[in-house]
Amino acid sequence: MDWQNPWQDATELSSKFAISHLAEEVGEVEKPRFAARPAYLYKQGLTPAEKGSAMHTYMQFCSYPAAARDADAELERLMADRFLTEEQGAAIETDRIRTFFESPLYRRIAGARQVWREYRFLAVIGEEELAGLADAGLGENRTTVQGVADCIFEEEDGIVIVDYKTDRVFSEDALRERYRVQLGLYGRLIGRALGRPVKECLLYSFALGRTIEVPF
């Protein structure tokens, strides 16, 4: 999701921006050269961004139980039902999908009390949250933010937020730092929206095949 008017005049009552990819806009870390290109998705035809979008579309519309049983068959269904084009389907390496569905993270999702996918939220934040975003040039007024979390699930002792990432990275620390601000805001604002405590914010890296906890 792209920024929407991130540098509104400070005299305005409020500004509005999207949280997704906040780290890239703020410039928290220097990205490795070509880091935005998910190398394992590279195939002739689609751009790297389109291939990453195809992976997210799979994760958005697939049946989790069906994908866990047979990721390739579920890909065929998504193409047959026109959630994905043939070109998009060809860009997805289902071994990456299988790694996710064989992970301890998926076992937690499968056993959760409740699961939300593509959870969209809108919130107004004030000085407390804005204080941590001073370098983003957002000013000091009330700011409306919008975002979407790929997956949220509820366990007995709280809410867990999961964001899927296709970035090409070489270490967990690089990915964790890149999305630290984004996930921190997700943790605070989604907990407020649901009225339940958020206990963990997690990234799942398809490039690394790992779950990465992000403190918030």
Placement of each model-derived feature along the sequence:
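Structural signature of nuclease core domains in nucleic-acid processing machines
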Residues: 1-216
